[in-house]
């Protein structure tokens, strides 16, 4: 039996690791919580509160053995930016969002949960590394991400949680990936290379949309097989680059992901220090239930 520290109930379910794209959900929180939510020094607090509420809700739902939150390093380019000048071009973040992204890892750490952030890597890469480690050790993982690139991580041991509407998450396994994209999870980078990704400014192959990309992959089996047969010879170098950019880097460095006991009380103290008192009260109440 496993004690759920949030709900104070026991569960027979074998816990998975929970891996979260921190930037993805911090952005959603920033745009979903009123800007009137302030913290100490009249700084923005909405993204912190919204992300914290999301984290608590997801923790109660999944009852994980461990949590890892991956973060982008926005002040340092990754190899993707160096390889493709247009990658993620035109993105701009409000100063208040940047400020909260800077301190959210501190909040997650106060909760007793793991964070991963390093120059040259994106949050996606830490998700891939954590999933690879968990599967290698025979465990299971749940990956929460608003980025469909994460579908490439789906397997019989890893489920993707994708936000679909307010407060709701779709559970994506290999069957759902095939239904949505018409390809297996391992071919999602090939699919993105052919179709392109407007949000990341990956151009793709001119004139090829989602159906065309899926059709080409069904015909050839993979992008590499298509290139080996001489297809798209003039674009081969670029397509391989697009595939590499769309592929999550499972070699990203990770902190230890041993079983965790959340420290909601410490997180409550930090929230109170930041004068986010409603959040502090909620965390303190959860901490009180987990001690029973």
Model regions: which residues?
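Noncatalytic, basic helical substrate-engagement surface that gates or grips nucleic-acid strands
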Residues: 5, 11-144, 148, 152-159, ...
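Non-catalytic nucleic-acid-binding/docking modules located in mid-to-C-terminal regions
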Residues: 4, 14-15, 65-68, 136, ...
């Amino acid at each position: 039996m496993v004690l759920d520290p949030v709900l104070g109930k026991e569960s027979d379910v074998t816990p998975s690791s929970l891996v979260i794209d921190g930037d993805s959900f911090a952005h959603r929180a920033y745009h979903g919580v009123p800007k009137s939510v302030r913290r100490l020094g009249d700084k923005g607090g909405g993204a912190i509160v919204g992300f914290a509420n999301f984290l608590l809700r997801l923790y109660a739902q999944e009852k994980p053995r461990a949590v890892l939150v991956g973060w982008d390093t926005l002040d340092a380019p990754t190899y993707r930016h160096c390889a493709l000048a247009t990658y993620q071009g035109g993105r701009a973040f409000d100063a208040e969002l940047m400020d909260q992204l800077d301190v959210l890892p501190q909040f997650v750490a106060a909760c007793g949960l793991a964070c991963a952030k390093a120059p040259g890597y994106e949050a996606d890469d830490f998700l891939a590394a954590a999933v690879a480690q968990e599967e290698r050790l025979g465990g299971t993982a749940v990956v929460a991400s608003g980025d469909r690139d994460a579908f490439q991580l789906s397997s019989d041991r890893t489920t993707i949680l994708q936000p679909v509407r307010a407060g709701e998450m779709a559970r994506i396994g290999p069957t759902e990936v095939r239904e949505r994209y018409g390809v297996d999870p391992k071919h999602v980078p090939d699919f993105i290379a052919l179709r392109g990704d407007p949000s990341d400014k990956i151009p793709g192959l001119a004139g090829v949309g989602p159906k065309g990309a899926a059709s080409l992959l069904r015909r050839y089996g993979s992008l590499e097989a298509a290139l080996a047969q001489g297809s798209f010879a003039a674009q081969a170098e670029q397509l391989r680059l697009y595939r590499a950019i769309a592929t999550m880097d499972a070699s990203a460095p990770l902190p230890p992901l041993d079983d965790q006991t959340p420290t909601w009380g410490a997180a409550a103290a930090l929230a109170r220090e930041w004068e986010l008192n409603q959040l502090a009260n909620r965390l303190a109440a959860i901490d009180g239930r987990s001690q029973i």
